[in-house]
Amino acid sequence: MKRTLEFVIDCGQENMDVRTFVRRYLGFSARILTALKYEGEMLKNGEPVHSNAVLKAGDTLTLTLLETGEAYEKADLPFAVLYEDEDFLVLDKPFNMPVHPSPGHDRDSVLNAAAWYSQNTPDFVFRPLYRLDRDTTGALVLAKNKFAANAKLTKTYRAVCEGETPESGCVNVPIGLKPGHKVERCAGIGDEAVTEFQTVKTSGGYSLVDFHLKTGRTHQIRVHMAHLGHPVAGDDLYGGHLDRTEHQMLCCCAVHLLCPALDIDKTVETDFSAEQKACFPELFQ
């Protein structure tokens, strides 16, 4: 999709070059600047300019990117839209839906569903800004253009964990692929992984816990909580029991979007489904 941004330079930005304005003032990455140079357009007062061009108060700087998205097979799979504008689509990812197509899941992914959802929009681009495990529910942000893909995100996860978790804590234990396994991870080997958590409520031998991730390792919350002896309920891969639910009780319950250049500073929230909450009434009353 084509996306054009226009800015009128004020006195506080005078004598900046285009590169400095785009990087420092707008907060865009060097990759965006490169894309504007080779795949897009930079205009000052309607005339093409290089990134070293100096800006004066009253100048109009126009930035345009044109891109086409990868074609995915369309699949009519329902999902709830939590928020949408010209730059972002935030959906409520259902249980048992992978984000990307993969062997065995070539037509039931989020991207297949997004292709169906956007089929009447020419050249629609949808770029997931992070992954959620197939059985993790909650807010998933799709960027509609490269400008949006540069947004800063802050996510909050919520889980039902077995046992009585501490009031708060920080787990700083590396995570890596379990030897001999293709999917399962384990704690104690691999890359640095840091998880902060805060217990919201404890009742009936289970705890409702909020998480903020300082790193983004595969299965990070699941592995770290299993390491502490408090696996996520319903997560039988890492020791969670299925006696109360067959659904993994892990949700991305909030995401904050920040991109001043796109005029967005917004928190989008969701929660476990009513069906999931009904399995743990003592935690959700």
List each model region and its residues:
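RNA pseudouridine synthases
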Residues: 1-285
